[in-house]
């Protein structure tokens, strides 16, 4: 994993953190990108992490809502993300704040 792109102002990558008393409790990073389907950008929420001891406190929702606000300010028309089908705890949150797209992901590592 590399964090160098977050420090490069020409990269459309962003990160937000939540902390209390200097301790990191959660983070989200997201990427603004173009799409062939629209003339405005999309935001891909690439990673969301919340420390286990504060899960269920609303912190994950707050981090996602930060991404929504950032997307709106940038003129993006959509925020989207992926999750593993076994991540049922997170999906309880996602089902309340977004809609399932119905798409399945296929990939081949190169």
What are these regions (language model features)?
Residues 1-15:
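Active-site rim helix/loop that mediates acceptor-substrate recognition in acyltransferases
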Residues 64, 71-83:
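Conserved GNAT acetyl-CoA-binding A-motif
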Residues 61, 73, 85-104, 108:
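Conserved active-site alpha-helix within GNAT-family acetyltransferase domains
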Residues 33, 51, 84:
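Residue-level recognition of the GNAT/N-acetyltransferase active site
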Residues 35-45, 55, 102:
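A conserved beta-turn-beta hairpin within the catalytic core of GNAT-like acetyltransferases
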Residues 54, 58-66:
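Conserved acetyl-CoA pyrophosphate-binding loop and the N-cap/start of the following alpha-helix
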Residues 17, 23-32, 49:
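Conserved beta-strand in the GNAT
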């Amino acid at each position: 994993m590399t964090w160098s792109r977050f420090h490069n102002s020409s990269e459309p990558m962003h990160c937000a953190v939540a902390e209390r008393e200097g301790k990191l409790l959660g983070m989200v990073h997201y990427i603004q990108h173009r799409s062939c389907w629209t003339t405005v950008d999309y935001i891909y929420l690439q990673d969301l992490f919340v420390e286990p001891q504060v899960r269920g406190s609303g912190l994950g929702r707050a981090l996602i809502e930060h991404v929504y606000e950032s997307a709106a300010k940038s003129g993006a028309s959509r925020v989207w993300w992926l999750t593993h089908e076994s991540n049922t705890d997170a999906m309880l949150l996602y089902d309340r704040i977004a809609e399932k797209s119905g798409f399945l992901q296929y990939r081949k590592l190169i």
